[in-house]
Amino acid sequence: MGVFTYETEFTSVIPPPRLFKAFILDADNLIPKIAPQAVKCAEIIEGDGGVGTIKKITFGEGSQFGSVTHKIDGIDKDNFVYSYSLVEGDALSDKIEKISYETKLVASSDGGSIIKSTSNYHTKGDVEIKEEHVKAGKEKASHLFKLVEGYLLANPNEYC
């Protein structure tokens, strides 16, 4: 088994506490509301929403994937860090055992946020993950993030 790590970073004008509430803590409700074409629904299969919780994410029509199952590995509300593993679903091919993600929000000097994301692809055997495959997924995640940011800018009294 190999592990391939990819890191990305982008910025937002939204401060970390507000962004964490919307983009992380309430994503299961907010994203299907503002982007049903991307995520149809999210449901807890097991757990209470905290560490160890298993969630099924069903994607919208037109998505290349039907659904995935996430396991929450960590939530640090004080330091705005969230980690989870994608453990099941059609996004995991016969080459990937699991994908672990960590998202950390830090305050930027202008009052907004710097979003740091790390993805660890745990492969089966000696398979290598192509960077363009990862970039396509990151672009979709970045698009969802921009939708959340736009929603927060348009609704300044939500997630305060």
From Swiss-Prot:
UniProt PTM: Phosphorylated in vivo. Phosphorylation prevents its activity as ribonuclease.
Transmembrane region(s): none
Gene3D superfamilies named among the record's database cross-references: 3.30.530.20
EC number(s) stated in the UniProt entry for this protein: 3.1.27.-
One GO biological process term: abscisic acid-activated signaling pathway
Keywords in alphabetical order: Allergen, Hydrolase, Nuclease, Pathogenesis-related protein, Phosphoprotein, Plant defense
Top-level taxon: Eukaryota
Gene Ontology MF term list: abscisic acid binding; nuclease activity; protein phosphatase inhibitor activity; signaling receptor activity
Keyword Nuclease assigned: yes
UniProt-listed InterPro entries: Bet_v_I/MLP, Bet_v_I_allergen, Plant_def-hormone_signal, START-like_dom_sf
Keyword Nuclease belongs to the record: yes
Signal peptide: none
GO cellular component term of the entry, any: cytoplasm
UniProt similarity note: Belongs to the BetVI family.
Role played: Possesses ribonuclease activity in vitro.
Matches recorded under PANTHER family: OS08G0374000 PROTEIN-RELATED, STRESS-INDUCED PROTEIN SAM22
Name listed for the protein in its UniProt record: Major strawberry allergen Fra a 1.05
Gene: Fra a 1.05
